[in-house]
């Protein structure tokens, strides 16, 4: 379908070739360019398709011969009529509207254009509603008549289709030669021109001349000129005139066309001053919107700088005794009025001010509606008319509160305060909403000090916070009461008392109070704090360590020892096993208190009350001496004698005996065996050298005398059940004395001689000869077919970097190194007995005779040692490679150690097992996961292996040297069959947007 485009601004020197060149790439049929020319440089171009026309319109504003052109959608009828009008002008018909025939042709042209527009698919501005709008409201029926009048009925004309940037001077130029008395531009609700205007002429003769300018151009626009009315002029802010004024002006001779219309307008003003029918003062009114609540008349005068404005011309609008964001301003002159309208959407105190024209009638209605409510409220404010209901309504009318939604359900008041960081909010001004079960709804109510602050806070609507888009709504206190919350009723004294009791940690007040929690936390949050306080009391161990709130002191019974919960004080004073049990913890404290403090402190209270000091003296002195007698005699003396004599006789000598000699026999050797780690960190580090000196007799006797016989002889009151109850102390203290003393003699002396001398000779001689000469015949004997497969994987593994032990190194190197260290590590670190004793990897290199005889010949192997299974005795698997140890133990980080800090591949000295090695179905089998998303975490990997028996702590995500994820991870299955099943089922399954690859390590 052919589409016609109208072009304006074509230069005089341009031709059809230039137009076609401008529309390069678009299809213009032959004969599709029609140049009209003229002052506006008009042309019509026909395009073959709608798409070409759409793309052509997008080139509006381009340049043809250094001249900017504008493009508009047109029709064939408009093009034909324009061409006909151009031809008639060439014949000499003159300008349209200069005669009757011109008017007839113009009217016929309009009718034809209307018919063509109704038939074509493109709408025209003529067949649209001719009613014009201001502030979104239509007024009157202004459709053009089918038969245009030759003379104007009144001096008012209505213009449609004006450019949006037009001003009054442009209108006067458009009606050049006519006396224009005034122009009112109609605007949208946002203050922009809508393309319509009302023009008032000095007389009906001038208005009739203006009607002849219908469908003339103003810039690049067709302007429609229609008859207006005085009612429209007054309704949109114009001033009415007397009936005689128009007659008087019509009788006057119109000035020549060349006379300045402004001079004529001034002279006409002096002869016939304008007066309104209502005899109200003259003025132009504007409606100001979106004003800041803090501005005053002075700010508006500065805003409308350059205008003649006083405080009496400014009127702020009030509603319910509260000032709104609306105001009205009256200007005395049209110039000031136009200056004010040009400031539309100008920012005043951080708010864009909307300036709309308004008629006096509408302004009075506006003010009357508000003033009526205000006067009623003033009457109720008089004495005798004040009621409680009205006071509540007046307060609730102020929107001081904000209802917040879409917070996280566990939001706290501190987080709400962070959201409103620019406002000073107390916790009492925030109320969190919970459901009937005490679970947070993610909603809150916040009260501000003034309505202005609340309105500023409402600007944070849809601000993202804590991962969600927070929604805000300004509400009044009456609406807040619908939530069951009344901020005004909350007693500040009660909240202050609650806050003070909360700071003191008064638990009785927290649990006995029946009042609803109306302060910083909701009901459920308050209950959560109570539970935390209870947990802290139940888990109390020591006031300096585990009690988190230092201002809450436990009773005196809790301060003596960390084990007061388990044993009564009587058991502590009489049981020697109790002395032995806290020796690891309390042995350090008495030593620091006794040897670093002044010695007088020990005699200020009787030894029965302080049960720590008698223990130390019980350790220092032999059992034959009764150490309580001198103390009882000392306490009977006066304090002065006690202080003067005791330090010289009793205190300076016993410490020399007890601390310098007896501790060497009693304290220091048993802790060397039982508590190997604490003495290194504890006191007396310079004396650590004495631990190794004591003779073996003292090493064995003190434990038998002090630890084993004393409970039976002197301390028979303590029950034996207390020692068996706590498993930690049962295994930490008694078992080390029973098990650790014999093993040093048993393992430190015989094993080095037994394992370092005979086993190396036994293992060094046979294996080199056995592996260098007979291994091929010895291991190729059983299945020949099974041996032919491994060489392929054997060579594959040698190409990989992670296999650090090729067969050449395994069989040609001396195997002594493999058997030197495991025996030492076996007895020095008992945690690795199952792996590093002569175990799987070591026995693979031995002949079958050695594998079967070694466990029988060595009775001192650990109890949990088991000979290797049949899988490792099979010759093909043993011949393939030396399988180093892969530590699947739990390191400090809680993850399995698959490499150095879980970064990259396995370290040197280890290798990743071959998936096809017959390593047994009962062994832990690692799987490597590749092509993982970089953001995948451990939980997603565990979910991926849901249903398979995976070791949870074995998941290890691999990282590169920069600490970034490589998209690979390693997991461990409990056996080989489970790993193969997972690889078979889960390979190429998606984890997020990626399909992962699974391989055995």
From Swiss-Prot:
Annotated region described as Disordered, given as residue ranges: 119-147, 247-278, 544-587, 631-882
Biased composition (Basic and acidic residues): 247-262, 631-881
SUPFAM superfamilies recorded: RNA-binding domain, RBD (SSF54928)
Residue spans of biased composition, Basic residues class: 263-278
Covalent link location (Glycyl lysine isopeptide (Lys-Gly) (interchain with G-Cter in SUMO2)): 114, 151, 335, 514, 541, 895
GO molecular function: RNA binding
GO CC terms, sorted: nucleoplasm; ribonucleoprotein complex
Record flagged with keyword Cell membrane: no
Keywords, ordered alphabetically: Acetylation, Isopeptide bond, Phosphoprotein, Repeat, RNA-binding, Ubl conjugation
This protein's name: RNA-binding protein 12B
